[in-house]
Swiss-Prot record:
Oligomeric form and interacting partners: Homodimer. Interacts with APOA1BP and CLU. Component of a sperm activating protein complex (SPAP), consisting of APOA1, an immunoglobulin heavy chain, an immunoglobulin light chain and albumin. Interacts with NDRG1. Interacts with SCGB3A2. Interacts with NAXE and YJEFN3.
Alphabetical UniProt keywords: Cholesterol metabolism, Glycoprotein, HDL, Lipid metabolism, Lipid transport, Lipoprotein, Oxidation, Palmitate, Phosphoprotein, Repeat, Secreted, Signal, Steroid metabolism, Sterol metabolism, Transport
Gene Ontology process terms (BP): adrenal gland development; amyloid-beta formation; blood vessel endothelial cell migration; cellular response to lipoprotein particle stimulus; cholesterol biosynthetic process; cholesterol efflux; cholesterol homeostasis; cholesterol import
Principal subcellular localisation of the protein: secreted
Protein name: Apolipoprotein A-I
Swiss-Prot/TrEMBL Sequence repeat ranges: 67-88, 89-110, 111-121, 122-143, 144-165, 166-187, 188-207, 208-229, 230-240, 241-264
UniProt source species: Jaculus jaculus
The record's account of how the chain is modified after translation: Glycosylated. Palmitoylated.
Function of the protein: Participates in the reverse transport of cholesterol from tissues to the liver for excretion by promoting cholesterol efflux from tissues and by acting as a cofactor for the lecithin cholesterol acyltransferase (LCAT). As part of the SPAP complex, activates spermatozoa motility.
Keyword Nucleus: no
Modified residue annotations for Methionine sulfoxide: M109
Region forming the signal peptide: 1-18
Compartment(s) of residence: Secreted
Length: 264
């Protein structure tokens, strides 16, 4: 579990551009980040699982049972690795096709968002300016009170608190007025964006291209399923000896333990 947590922390703390920084590659697309996350997570689970198996085999019970779990784990890991290698090109093709087929929709939505952003930016700038003015006004009023505190020390602490409370409430109330005004100004654009999104989705639903995309997606999934069958069969064949060996070892250990109990 520690390895899984570490992998997730590294992935998120380094950010989506970590590969771009270290390898000087082009920034990753969202699809690439999803695929990299899946790879990191699977590798972390595999490594942490091997650590737990190793710890168990090193324990007194593990040595007594002598199940050779670590050897079986390595065999299983190699089999899974071969499966990933065989499915790699297939999954890459599926993600590439999906990204290509939905590119037009992302472009349309980005265009709508950019248009709304340009229209609401003046309101956001005005709100930020007014908020900064209120904060500066509050700071000017609080400054002399801080000097009073330093001069009067603890005996004036309660008095200072009483003076600060109405100032803080006044700042809160004035900020609320600006927020309400901003919300009122942005409401038409929010409704407009919601209507545009609904229109886009309705157009997609009624468009023949949706049926075409559905057919393409079904075709991609069918191709992925057909190409994955041989790899999954190889995985099953690779697991059978591991499971049989584990079954035999466990049964032998149970039988030996039963004999020892009967002999006592």
């Amino acid at each position: 579990m520690k390895a899984v947590v570490l992998a997730l922390a590294v992935l998120f703390l380094t950010g989506s551009q970590a590969r771009h920084f270290w390898q000087q590659d082009d920034p990753q697309s969202p699809w690439d980040r999803v695929k990299d996350f899946a790879t990191v997570y699977v590798d972390a689970v595999k490594d942490s699982g091997r650590d737990y198996v190793s710890q168990f085999e090193s324990s007194a019970l593990g040595k007594q049972l002598n199940l050779h779990l670590l050897d079986n784990w390595d065999t299983l890991s190699n089999t899974v690795g071969r499966l990933r290698e065989q499915l790699g090109p297939v999954t890459h093709e599926f993600w590439a096709n999906l990204e290509k087929d939905t590119e037009w929709l992302r472009q349309e939505m980005n265009k709508d968002l950019e248009e709304v952003k340009v229209k609401v930016q003046p309101y956001l700038d005005d709100f930020q300016k007014k908020w900064q003015e209120e904060v500066e006004r509050y700071r000017e009023k609080v400054g002399p009170l801080g000097a009073e505190l330093r001069e009067g020390a603890r005996q004036k602490l309660q008095e200072l608190h009483e003076k600060l409370t109405p100032l803080g409430e006044d700042l809160r109330d004035r900020a609320r007025v600006h927020v309400d005004a901003l919300r009122t100004q942005l409401a038409p654009y929010s409704d407009q964006m919601r209507e545009r999104l609904a229109t886009r989705l309705a157009a997609i639903r009624d468009s023949p291209s949706l049926a075409v995309y559905h057919a393409k997606a079904s075709e991609h999934l069918k191709t992925l399923s057909e190409k994955a069958k041989p790899a999954l069969e190889d995985l099953r064949q690779g697991l059978m000896p591991v499971l049989e060996n584990l079954k035999t070892t466990v049964l032998a250990a149970i039988d030996e333990a039963s004999k020892k109990l009967n002999a006592q």
